[in-house]
Design a protein with these regions (language model features):
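Enriched for short, Lys/Arg-rich terminal
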Residues: 1-24
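N-terminal intrinsically disordered, cationic/polar leader segments
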Residues: 26-113, 117-147
Length: 147
């Protein structure tokens, strides 16, 4: 019997190798027990696509981990004194060093809460609370549903 980790790695390889060339690729995902292995393609926005999966699969609570490449990322911090979100946008060739967070529901609405770290080609790392990340290459994510 294959372990879940091996199954996840196999699914990611399959999705990368089997990629059919189209003008517009769409996100793909596969479920293994309580985990969704997700590939997000160039031009797609991470938060929107993960919310789409959660709603389609009726996921009420889950946590996320992943890596990938983005061309535009907006993230920041909440200023607790001024009670305002201070966001920054980075554009260019950015490696997603790490993305993590959760999906939950409140009053029937799906909410995402993700944090991201990205690195530029000089090795500078930026990050914070994620509001937008547009994929430039591919995003490889694992969403684990909590029952």
């Amino acid at each position: 019997m294959k372990t879940p980790r091996k199954e996840i790695a196999r699914a990611l390889r399959y999705m990368q190798d089997y990629k059919i060339k189209k003008e517009s690729m769409i996100m793909e995902y596969k479920k293994f027990n309580n985990q969704y292995v997700i590939r997000i393609d160039k031009g797609e926005e991470i938060c929107a696509k993960l919310k789409e999966v959660a709603q389609k699969e009726n996921i009420k609570l889950a946590y996320l981990t992943g890596i990938g490449a983005a061309g535009k990322v907006t993230a920041g911090v909440f200023d607790t004194k001024e009670k305002v979100f201070k966001g920054h946008t980075w554009e260019g060739d950015l490696e997603i060093v790490s993305i993590g967070g959760n999906i939950n529901t409140m009053n029937g609405e799906t909410y995402t809460h993700f944090h991201i770290s990205v690195a530029d080609e000089a090795g500078n790392v930026y990050g914070g609370h994620l509001t937008e990340a547009v994929i430039s290459g591919t995003g490889e994510l694992v969403l684990t549903e909590i029952e």
